[in-house]
């Protein structure tokens, strides 16, 4: 029998001790105290942070919202059915975020980035982890809004222009065409996408029926708008937490494009439902309620979301220093990008002075107000020009449009006043009669059918005729027919004129061409 040397034993023991890793993987784990209505209270997570992601043992994720003395209140991003009292919950040490890359374009996702369109998983191998909640860019990193965002809607582009980086509220009662304006704007970006100057669109559906979202996606597909669009959907059947976080997911995706020097448009449809979801979550978390039972910080909820829309400074060295930049974007930031927001608010019986509508009006850079009465009279889009406004104004218009449509808003407001008085008087002077006639005809010109956005060059040509009274020989009921004939001639015989107008140039030779064509077309109606 061989003798074992003591020195060999000590060497073997020493080798084994050295091979043991000293690193230990600690996980902070808590237990579920209570769970109800999409909210769970967890005991034991003493170091949990606000907005941190938590993972339950069955794989369900949750986000920390309340930090209390003895427990943590969190909202569940899934069903509560598999979660029981005493179940273990662990910290992920990650702030709530969404993974984003270009493969998301053309897809329908939920607020945590999972595909819900049945087209398989999205390849997120090379993706950016964008935080859902993030501070808005500071004043130094912004620039004044000066580039137009063309909606293709005559009434908007001429009288309530929207610029890249602006927040323009769309407000009105149900069934007045709010979503239609947003969808038309998305469809109108197709020409820019084809020219290689895309405006990426994010449509956020909050608390809508799944069938409504499916119909909208189908509409976007039919008009070729999905290749540059991402739809984020938290439907009515999803938990309140999902509806609450959906707009933040949309903003995070928009920031991914904005901070890389690209242009993005995000539509929140609609923020009234997000406020209701936030109220629901807050009341279950036992937060003190305020006016209309909304929590006291409901204004801050919308302001911090909408302030994330911005036109970023074009100077590269300034843009790179942007505040609260996610780690994944450091060194990849490009200046000059923009994120435009079109929040939608639903009013009850035209009451614009309610709590949430007044909050959002005070945050945004203007509003497009839609009226049921105008909609029912057949004026669509049913925009009330009198109280709709864009606080960016002419700086978000091309020069030709600014020149042609400069007085259109005032003219239409005056026409509305005169029309109200004309109902009471039988005789009127020639000037008043002419103003009323021109107003009625311009009203007809501004009517536009859904899903048919008009290129800006064609808009300028039509509005030049309208504001200069060149449709005078045409009866009011034939105005739209005459407009279509006029545009047909312009497209076939003078495409260069329309192209030049679209580039913002207008001179005497161009106006002479327009006047000649409209005289020939309008002459047929004498």
Each language-model region and where it sits:
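Phosphate-interacting basic helix/loop segments used at nucleotide- and nucleic-acid interfaces
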Residues: 12-20, 92, 151-156, 250, ...
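Phosphate-binding/switch loop-helix module in NTP-utilizing enzymes
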Residues: 242-278, 330-331
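P-loop NTPase nucleotide-binding/switch module
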Residues: 87-89, 96, 100-103, 116-166, ...
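Loop/turn-to-beta-strand initiation segments
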Residues: 198-200, 227-230, 261-265, 336-341
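Walker A/P-loop NTP-binding active-site region of P-loop NTPases
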Residues: 164-215, 270
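Acidic-enriched and Gly/Ser
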Residues: 2-16, 22-25, 31-149
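Conserved catalytic/coupling modules of large nucleotide/cofactor-utilizing molecular machines
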Residues: 256, 273, 280-526
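Nucleotide-state-sensitive switch-loop elements of NTP-binding domains
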Residues: 199, 209-253, 283-295, 302-307, ...
């Amino acid at each position: 029998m061989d003798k074992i040397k003591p020195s060999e034993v000590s060497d073997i023991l020493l080798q084994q001790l050295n091979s043991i890793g000293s690193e230990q993987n600690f996980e902070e784990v808590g237990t579920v105290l209570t769970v109800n209505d999409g909210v769970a209270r967890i005991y034991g997570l003493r170091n949990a942070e606000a907005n941190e992601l938590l993972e339950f043992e069955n794989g369900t994720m949750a986000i920390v919202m309340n930090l209390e003395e003895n427990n943590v209140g969190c909202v569940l991003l899934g069903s509560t059915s598999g979660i029981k009292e005493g179940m273990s919950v662990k910290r992920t040490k990650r702030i709530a975020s969404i993974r984003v890359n270009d493969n998301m374009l053309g897809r329908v996702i939920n607020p945590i980035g999972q595909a819900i369109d049945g087209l398989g998983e999205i390849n997120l191998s090379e993706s950016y982890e964008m935080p859902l909640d993030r501070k808005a860019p500071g004043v130094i990193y912004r620039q004044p809004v000066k580039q137009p965002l063309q909606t293709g809607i005559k009434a908007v582009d001429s009288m309530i222009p929207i610029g890249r980086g602006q927040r323009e509220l769309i407000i009105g009662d149900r069934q007045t065409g709010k979503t239609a304006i947003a969808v038309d704007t998305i469809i109108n970006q197709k020409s820019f996408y084809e020219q290689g100057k895309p405006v990426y669109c994010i449509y956020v559906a909050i608390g809508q029926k799944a069938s409504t979202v499916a119909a909208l996606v189908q509409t976007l597909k039919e008009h070729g708008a999905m290749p540059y669009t991402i739809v984020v959907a938290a439907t009515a059947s999803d938990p309140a937490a999902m509806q609450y976080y959906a707009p933040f997911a949309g903003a995070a995706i928009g920031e991914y494009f904005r901070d890389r020097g690209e242009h993005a448009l995000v539509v929140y449809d609609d923020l009234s439902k997000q406020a209701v979801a936030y109220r629901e979550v807050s009341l279950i978390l036992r937060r003190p309620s305020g006016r209309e039972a909304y929590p006291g910080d409901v204004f801050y909820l919308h302001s911090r979301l909408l302030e994330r829309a911005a036109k970023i400074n074009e100077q590269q060295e300034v843009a790179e220093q942007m505040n609260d930049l996610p780690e994944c974007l450091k060194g990849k930031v490009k200046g000059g990008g923009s994120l435009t927001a079109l929040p939608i608010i639903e009013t009850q019986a035209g009451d614009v002075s309610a709590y949430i509508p007044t909050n959002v009006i005070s945050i945004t850079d203007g509003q497009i107000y839609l009226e049921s009465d105008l909609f029912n009279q057949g004026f669509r889009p049913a925009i009330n020009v009198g109280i709709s406004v864009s606080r960016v104004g002419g700086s978000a218009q091309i020069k030709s449009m600014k020149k042609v449509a400069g007085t259109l808003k005032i003219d239409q407001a005056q026409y509305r006043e005169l029309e109200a008085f004309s109902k009471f008087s039988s005789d009127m002077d020639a000037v008043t009669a002419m103003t009323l006639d021109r107003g009625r005809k311009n009203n007809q010109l501004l009517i536009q059918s859904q899903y048919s956005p008009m290129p800006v060059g064609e808009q300028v040509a039509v509005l030049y005729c309208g504001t200069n009274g060149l449709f005078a020989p045409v009866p009011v009921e034939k105005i739209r027919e005459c407009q279509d004939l006029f545009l047909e001639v312009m497209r076939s015989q003078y495409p260069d004129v329309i192209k030049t107008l679209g580039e913002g140039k207008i001179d005497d030779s161009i106006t002479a061409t327009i006047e000649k064509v409209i005289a020939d077309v309008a002459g047929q109606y004498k």
